[in-house]
């Protein structure tokens, strides 16, 4: 089978490689010429994805994967098209379909009868049927569900472990009609493998969600649930700080009961998924007060971490504060919606001099993000740990001459390594 994958980003490229490893002929499409050139050389354009470098080199050398900037031409040669183009939201939470609409137009230009189109980008409910189907029909002159198949099948993977997650989680498929759904199921059964999951009541594999709307909502529901759960954990954590309770012990105790699944609190909820997809849901359901309140609560956590620091050292004016972590989580070079932005902004509003460190970023990259790099070993008044990189776990007060306070936003540091320093964690009282 010949397959076009549109957008070779941190999800799209591993998907293209996965399809190619199953023996299919894959054309990867991207608007970035540099990305296309690197892929055609078998070089991964971004670091941090397990096995991608090895697998990419293998499938390119075997002739199973090529890349191009000509999406319409690639689609015209393909039996199936998979779209993983990013969808953004503006400051008011309104989806910005610019990139998605442009990619959809290019796909429609090259579309031929009998092709399957699968959107994997997370979308508001109804988008596949009500926005993209008419757009494709208008440009191509073909009828959705009759001349071509159209489905929504959300990506459910985490960057850094895409190949493992593709095997681990059921692939959800829903089409605009039954024929499209069946075509989608047949396609994904041909391109994916699945781990045995005895914990599931339905066998792991490709799952029929019935409609594109159900499939769209399934992805929004699973990610919005996580955001709401984390917000609840964060509110528990803030209360625990004032009551001198260790919330980590409370959550562990609560979760020993099988119906309790409280997530872990922390300084921020970042990345391309959890901070964004609840806003898609709110676009569909603007009266969802629980979802809106949860999003606002999580967005306020970086400022809460700065409040803890202010409680520990007093006025932050002219204080040197090192923020550890540009990435939104440990082990991944990705700054999308990272807590570093809210943390730095809040510190600057309090008059602090802010320095930023991350072992995965060069000083030049940190500067390009608008931050001042921290020089390892230089004196600071305080430290806020924002990302749980493994490199940070063994840090001691000797690494930060003159440090008077530590705020551990991810609870990975050892208080014993900071004897004599005011040490605070999210969800725990003062550990002086």
Which role does the model predict for each range below?
Residues 1-432:
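Structural/interface elements that position substrates and couple domains in central-metabolism enzymes
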């Amino acid at each position: 089978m010949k397959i076009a994958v549109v957008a070779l980003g941190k999800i799209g490229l591993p998907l293209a490689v996965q399809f190619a490893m199953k023996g299919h002929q894959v054309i990867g499409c991207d608007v970035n010429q540099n990305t296309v050139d690197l892929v055609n050389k078998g070089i991964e354009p971004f670091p941090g994805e397990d096995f991608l470098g090895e697998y990419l080199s293998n499938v390119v050398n075997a002739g199973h994967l090529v890349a191009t900037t000509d999406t319409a031409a690639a689609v015209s040669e393909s039996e199936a098209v998979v779209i993983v183009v990013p969808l953004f939201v503006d400051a008011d939470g309104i989806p910005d379909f610019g990139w998605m609409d442009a990619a959809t137009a290019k796909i429609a230009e090259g579309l031929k009868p009998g092709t399957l189109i699968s959107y994997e980008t997370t979308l508001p409910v109804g988008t596949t049927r009500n926005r993209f189907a008419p757009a494709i029909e208008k440009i191509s002159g073909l009828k959705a569900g009759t001349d071509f198949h159209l489905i929504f099948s959300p990506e459910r993977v985490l960057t850094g472990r895409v190949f493992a997650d593709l095997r681990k989680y059921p692939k959800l498929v829903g089409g605009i009609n039954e024929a499209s759904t069946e075509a989608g199921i047949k396609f994904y059964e041909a391109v994916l493998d699945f781990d045995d999951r005895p914990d599931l009541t339905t066998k792991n594999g490709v799952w029929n969600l019935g409609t594109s709307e159900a499939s769209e909502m399934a992805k929004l529901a699973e990610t919005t649930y996580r955001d709401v759960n984390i917000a609840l954990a964060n509110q528990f954590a803030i209360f625990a700080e004032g009551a001198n309770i260790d919330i980590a012990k409370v959550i562990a105790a609560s979760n020993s009961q099988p119906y309790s699944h409280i997530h872990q609190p922390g300084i921020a909820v970042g990345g391309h998924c959890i901070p964004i997809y609840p806003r898609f849901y709110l676009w569909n359901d603007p009266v969802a007060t629980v979802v809106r309140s949860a999003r606002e609560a999580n967005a306020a956590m970086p400022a809460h971490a700065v409040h803890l620091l202010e409680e520990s050292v007093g006025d932050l004016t002219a204080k040197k504060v090192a923020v550890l972590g540009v990435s939104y989580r440990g082990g991944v070079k990705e700054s999308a919606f990272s807590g570093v932005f809210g943390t730095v902004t809040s510190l600057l509003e309090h008059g602090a001099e802010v320095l930023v460190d991350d072992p995965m970023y060069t000083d030049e990259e940190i500067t390009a993000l608008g931050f001042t790099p921290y020089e390892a070993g230089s004196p600071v008044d305080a430290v806020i740990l924002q990302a749980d990189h493994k490199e940070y776990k063994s840090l001691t007060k000797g690494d930060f001459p003159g440090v008077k306070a530590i705020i551990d936003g991810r609870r990975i540091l050892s208080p014993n390594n900071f004897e004599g320093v005011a040490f605070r964690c999210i969800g725990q009282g003062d550990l002086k």
